[in-house]
Amino acid sequence: MSKKIPFVTKEQLEKIVSQYPTPFHLYDEAGIRRTARLVNKAFSWNKGFKEYFAVKATPNPYLLQILREEGCGADCSSYTELQMSDAVGFKESEIMFSSNATPAEDFKLARKLNVTINLDDITHIDFLEKVADIPETVCCRYNPGGHFAIANNIMDNPGDAKYGMTHEQIIEAYKILKSKGVKNFGIHAFLASNTVTNEYYPELARILFELAVELKEKTGAHISFINLSGGIGIAYKPEQQDNDVLAIGEGVRKVFEELLVPAGMGDVKLFTELGRYMLAPNGALVTTAIHQKHIYKEYIGCDACAANLMRPAIYGSYHHITVMGKENAPCDHKYDVTGGLCENNDKFAVDRMLPEINIGDLLFIHDAGAHGFSMGYNYNGKLRSAELLLQEDGSVKMIRRAETPADYFATFDFGEYGPKLAEEAKIKM
């Protein structure tokens, strides 16, 4: 079995903890830049290629700035994600707006910023025209329905997903949009999540490239770009094989040359919207073991909880755990590693074989750089933790402070309880 190795040493982490108390999310700048460059290299054969980082995965302006410096754009799905991306400096075509059940205010802001809009439904054409206007460049999201399979292995069930247009709808949508003055069209689809296979993108590309040729023939539309969206996953478990993004890029190139080039569409730009692949391995949740409990099972209680990393609780997802300083110790103790929420599913690991854990040990929970902090919440009155960046020079920078009681009570800044709660928030233990 291969090993997952933390991107920080025990000595480094102890120094960080002396300044920033656990729990916190820690990100690796060098790893983020390395991953971005690898993705750009994998698709460098396509002159118009651009990776649009899925902001929903890790919405932090400091991290977005790193990705912007590496040539990435921003994939936004909400009003505030648009605002954050604009504040960082992403402009117009550097932002892709992909949303569903979209509020009018979101569309209005997207048009004000002149970003590329990806329409989720054919009815959104009239809705967008009513609340704003129809731009010259529009993308449409496609859902082929049925089950999506690779080599007879079902990857996901698009037919049960709420996203995208049917085959008939997207053809009709192109005709309508063209009649309303749209000059440049894009196609987008997301058919499977967290795939750990080099075949996903090439198979998705085949579906979208064939659709692009058909749309050109049936509507006369100019297909400017095709967005392969996300779905490229990571190996959360040590025994899993990582995706080879260079092989993935080469696989897409072969399909591109097979289908689009002969159709006179060799100038089509390719986009991706990778969130998990870009950030998950380059981030971790760091927590301290603060309690041991010996009942019917052995429990290790941490100062982090599902409010800091929700995936194990709601999806049963595996996140590898390294007990810092005990990387080479035998994994001969079986633990449930838990947080302090009043929910029995608040567990980072169940029946996990780990080295003996003592109170005060630092636990490095791997692959929490995406869908970690971003899915946090305040149930049980828990406060969201800080986010820190391990910079390339080895220094550490706080890129989001930890929440305080004052933050938690901030939305009661009216009426009789506002002043009382503000006073409570000032009390220091």
Predicted features along the sequence, with ranges:
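Conserved, mostly hydrophobic/aromatic
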Residues: 32, 56, 78, 110, ...
